[in-house]
Amino acid sequence: MSMTVTTSSNVSDAAMLSRLALQIKSWGKALGFAQIGICDTDLTAEEAKLQTWLDKGFHGEMAYMETHGMMRARPHELHSGTVRVISARMDYLPPEAGFATNLASPNMGYISRYAGGRDYHKLIRARLKKLGDQINSELVALGFDAADFRPFVDSAPVLERPLAEKAGIGWTGKHSLILNHDAGSWFFLGELLINLPLPVDIPVQEGCHSCVACITSCPTGAIVEPYTVDARRCISYLTIELQGAIPEEFRPLMGNRIYGCDDCQLVCPVNRAAPLTQESDFHIRPKLKQPELLTLFTWSETEFLKQTEGSAIRRIGHQRWLRNIAVALGNAPSSADIISALEQRKAQADVDEMVKEHIDWALAQQRAGDLQTNNRKTERLVRVIQKGLPRDA
């Protein structure tokens, strides 16, 4: 339902909307969002970029990126009547992140820090719903009809990063993530699509300048040019989105990263002063904090489902979990214990052929016995973290 004015003139309506926009930002912070921004729905400039990216096949097996076509760049088609997008930022950097400790320990599994706690999708969507309800309560109290709104997170076909940039949340870094001068890139985004003509915010100035740290540090060279990521090369894609076999050329480069990758964020100088999350739900679960690869590899499917309940990790399923860990074990220092664990897991009936192929690769790597426990990029990354992010090292 569109907003219907019952008492105010257009001038007073504009003033009311300005006041409401300020209230929305205040309500958002009370709900746990670190920042709220507002923008219009025009993403025309992004359509050509999206189509080029898709045409080059950079989305890999993420067919859903292509299925929804340009709807991603047209919020008003995603939710009819939408004239504004309220973009919300929620910080997730956990305390005692232990980045360097984890990456420097090849017998431990590295899990991207966004996934160490509770799955953010339901949490953020619920908070956005509360924000929409507060907006409508205020509108009704002022004598207006309730607005029509719909909350989204990144599981929906919406270009959240360009919207966040338009809404003044930050600028697009060369790694394609949104960067904020105060918060770096350690945050989730959510959107509230609404048919309320609120005043929009001003985008911030780009701040990367000549820095290319993210590009040069990517383990697999996935940032093929500034602002462009070939997902097919990205460790996050390979360990989370890819359903089949991980190409052999990338396996040695993955190191101990078993779910996602944070390297491009860890070297970014904008992240040096990033705040810790205020959400305890995003703190790393004890059994996912500096976890031993051999321990994780013994988890049955039942144990996997139990330990990942309410976590984003659960979506990859037990077989891909084993696939990723097998690769990490193949990259670990040669060990009789690892070889034994790989052989035992391969012999189990619940292991599919895809996982067995990765186990065979890992066994060959282990038996070669001349592995480098850390490649040069990882060693350099650890030094960068220790120097630039001492609190989180």
UniProtKB/Swiss-Prot annotation:
Domain of life: Bacteria
Cofactor comment text: Binds 2 [4Fe-4S] clusters per monomer.
Residues annotated as domain 4Fe-4S ferredoxin-type: 196-228
Gene3D superfamilies assigned: 3.30.70.20
GO BP term (any one): queuosine biosynthetic process
Positions of [4Fe-4S] cluster 2 binding: C218, C234, C261, C264
Catalytic activity of the protein: epoxyqueuosine(34) in tRNA + AH2 = queuosine(34) in tRNA + A + H2O
Associated pathway: tRNA modification; tRNA-queuosine biosynthesis
GO molecular function: 4 iron, 4 sulfur cluster binding; epoxyqueuosine reductase activity; metal ion binding
Record: residues binding [4Fe-4S] cluster 1: C208, C211, C214, C268
The protein's required cofactors: cob(II)alamin; [4Fe-4S] cluster
Record InterPro entries: 4Fe4S_Fe-S-bd (IPR017896), 4Fe4S_Fe_S_CS (IPR017900), QueG (IPR004453), QueG_DUF1730 (IPR013542)
GO cellular component: cytoplasm
Annotated compartments: Cytoplasm
Keywords on record: 4Fe-4S, Cytoplasm, Iron, Iron-sulfur, Metal-binding, Oxidoreductase, Queuosine biosynthesis, tRNA processing
Catalytic residue positions: D154 (proton donor)
EC number(s) reported in the record: 1.17.99.6
Top EC class of this enzyme: oxidoreductase
Assembly notes: Monomer.
PANTHER family tied to this protein: EPOXYQUEUOSINE REDUCTASE
Function: Catalyzes the conversion of epoxyqueuosine (oQ) to queuosine (Q), which is a hypermodified base found in the wobble positions of tRNA(Asp), tRNA(Asn), tRNA(His) and tRNA(Tyr).
Family recorded in the similarity comment: Belongs to the QueG family.
Name of protein: Epoxyqueuosine reductase
Organismal lineage: Bacteria, Pseudomonadati, Pseudomonadota, Gammaproteobacteria, Alteromonadales
Gene expressing this chain: queG
